[in-house]
Amino acid sequence: MLMLKVHHIGYLVKKMDAAILSFKNLGYRIKQDTVYDEIRKINICFLEKDGYCIELVSPVSEDSVVAGLLKKYKNCPYHICYETTDFETDFETLRTEGFMPIDTPTPAPALSGKEVVFMTHAALGMIELIKSGI
């Protein structure tokens, strides 16, 4: 059995500033200011409440990796990010358990450049895997 820790819940938003304000009104605090991810063409902001972390993700262009998802699903949670101490081994284990990589592991600017990979599973949807230590 994998021993993965939940790092955050990814939340798609159309308007970053409005989403930040709404989450702050719910008692969240900004954990990390908004960061632009040039590879994925998204703005990212981390907020925290009661030990839970959410990642607000907003596309900045029509060819962003999440622009299509936002059009289809609107503002909504869309992935769970899991933290691992053994990225390569857990990545391969997830593959054998039916998770399909959407992309190759790449550095994430909003996560101190740590490698992340997004994967999908027919029964679970999308997850993100990240090296621990963030």
Briefly describe each language-model feature range.
Residues 1-40:
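Long, hydrophobic N-terminal alpha-helical segment
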Residues 32-33, 63-68:
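A short, acidic/glycine-rich surface segment
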Residues 1-2, 5-15, 34-36, 43-50, 54-55, 67-89, 93, ...:
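Vicinal oxygen chelate
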Residues 17, 53, 62, 86-88, ...:
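Residues that cap or initiate secondary-structure elements
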